[in-house]
């Protein structure tokens, strides 16, 4: 193995998602089974000891691809030479907290991290924001990194995409491997729109196969959009392993490419496609190749879809205005 190790930075590394993520990165699932990695674990000062415990366990796995671990509470150190950054750590919403308060609290995290990425990361840096509100946190980080191409900042909607795949597979009596071209549009929030109108199930149009708009509107979309809350209700804690899995999927697909005839969903800076205002970070259908992505163009958007895309995009535009008003972008 003569390849240069890839520097992967994970923030919130001692948290539940971080714990579910790090061992999979170290085993080669993030970038590939032949790609050595060095891990940088960024945590807040009180959590450094817990991060050290996780690092001890990583050492004890003796992963052949893992060529070093560094633990720090300094973003400038964590992002120095980083090739891939997974921004997992975020301020969760607590009871009685308004959305503006949440955005402001997260601005205090993602603005300094964006600046550190701007000043210290490698030229080929790829950023995935997992910590919620992911789309707008990604926008805050991106705005603080003017020297980094905007398209390198992405937000995770792959968890929603994966959730939608399974719900559609269950409804149609198929497997997730049978489903192609599903799309998540908009925000990673309850307004997101999982779109099956261009999807196929075993080669046949998914919407025609389902042929049940009531199920689509009353069951499928709410189940996918509110799945996170349902998991908290059932588990007593938020999605961790499934979120980590989606982060792995997102980066692996970004780096290694989508399958022929298929696409995926990523939260990316809009170029104005499909009437989504330029600059907001919204989920789109994308194909990826050689570490780059392109929005799938030319899809017909019916009235059912248009109304739902517009509602989610409106929320994203409002979030952008809120963080602009707070001086975060």
Curated annotation (Swiss-Prot):
NAD(+) binds at residues 12-18, 106, 113, 130-132. Substrate binds at residues 93, 99, 132, 163. The keyword DNA repair does not apply. It comes from the Bacteria. Optimum pH is 6.8 at 50 degrees Celsius and 8.5 at 30 degrees Celsius. Its EC number is 1.1.1.37. Activity is inhibited by Zn(2+) and Co(2+). No activity in the presence of Fe(2+). CDD domains: MDH_chloroplast-like (cd01338). Keywords: NAD, Oxidoreductase, Tricarboxylic acid cycle. It catalyses: (S)-malate + NAD(+) = oxaloacetate + NADH + H(+). GO terms for biological process: malate metabolic process; NADH metabolic process; oxaloacetate metabolic process; tricarboxylic acid cycle. The active site is at residue 188. The keyword Cytoplasm does not apply. It is an enzyme of class 1 (oxidoreductase). GO terms for molecular function: L-malate dehydrogenase (NAD+) activity. Pfam families: Ldh_1_C, Ldh_1_N. InterPro entries: L-lactate/malate_DH (IPR001557), Lactate/malate_DH_C (IPR022383), Lactate/malate_DH_N (IPR001236), Lactate_DH/Glyco_Ohase_4_C (IPR015955), Malate_DH_AS (IPR001252), Malate_DH_type2 (IPR010945), NAD(P)-bd_dom_sf (IPR036291). Optimum temperature is 50 degrees Celsius. Homodimer. Belongs to the LDH/MDH superfamily. MDH type 2 family. PANTHER family: MALATE DEHYDROGENASE. Catalyzes the reversible oxidation of malate to oxaloacetate. Exhibits remarkably higher catalytic efficiency for oxaloacetate reduction than for malate oxidation in vitro. Shows a high specificity for NAD(H), being almost inactive with NADP(H). This is Malate dehydrogenase. The gene is mdh.
């Amino acid at each position: 193995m003569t390849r240069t190790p890839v520097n992967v930075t994970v923030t919130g590394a001692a948290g539940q998602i971080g714990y579910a993520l790090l061992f999979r990165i170290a085993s080669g699932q993030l970038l590939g089974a032949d790609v050595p990695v060095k891990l940088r674990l960024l945590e807040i000062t009180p959590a450094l000891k817990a991060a050290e415990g996780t690092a001890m366990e990583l050492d004890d796995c003796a992963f052949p691809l893992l060529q070093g671990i560094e633990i720090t509470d300094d973003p400038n150190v964590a992002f120095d030479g980083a090739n891939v950054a997974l921004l997992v750590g975020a301020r969760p919403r607590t009871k009685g907290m308004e959305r503006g308060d949440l955005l402001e609290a997260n601005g205090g995290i993602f603005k300094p991290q964006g600046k550190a990425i701007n000043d210290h990361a490698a030229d080929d840096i790829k950023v995935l924001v997992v910590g919620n509100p992911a789309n707008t946190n990604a926008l805050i980080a991106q705005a603080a990194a003017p020297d980094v191409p905007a398209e390198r900042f992405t937000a995770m909607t792959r968890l929603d995409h994966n959730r939608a795949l399974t719900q559609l597979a269950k409804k149609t009596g198929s497997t997730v491997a049978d489903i192609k071209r599903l799309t998540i549009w908009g925000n990673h929030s309850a307004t997101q729109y999982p779109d099956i109108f261009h999807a196929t199930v075993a080669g046949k149009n998914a919407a025609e196969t389902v042929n049940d708009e009531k199920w689509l509107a009353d069951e499928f979309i709410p189940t996918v959009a509110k799945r996170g809350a349902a998991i908290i209700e059932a588990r007593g804690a938020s999605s961790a392993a499934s979120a980590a899995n989606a982060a792995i999927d997102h980066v692996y697909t970004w780096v290694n490419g989508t399958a022929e005839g298929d696409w995926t969903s990523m939260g990316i800076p809009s170029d104005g496609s499909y009437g989504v205002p330029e600059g907001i970070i919204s989920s789109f259908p994308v194909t990826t190749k050689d570490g780059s992505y392109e929005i799938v163009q030319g899809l017909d958007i019916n009235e059912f879809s248009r109304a739902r895309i517009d509602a989610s995009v409106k929320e994203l535009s409002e979030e952008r205005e809120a963080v602009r008003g707070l001086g975060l972008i």
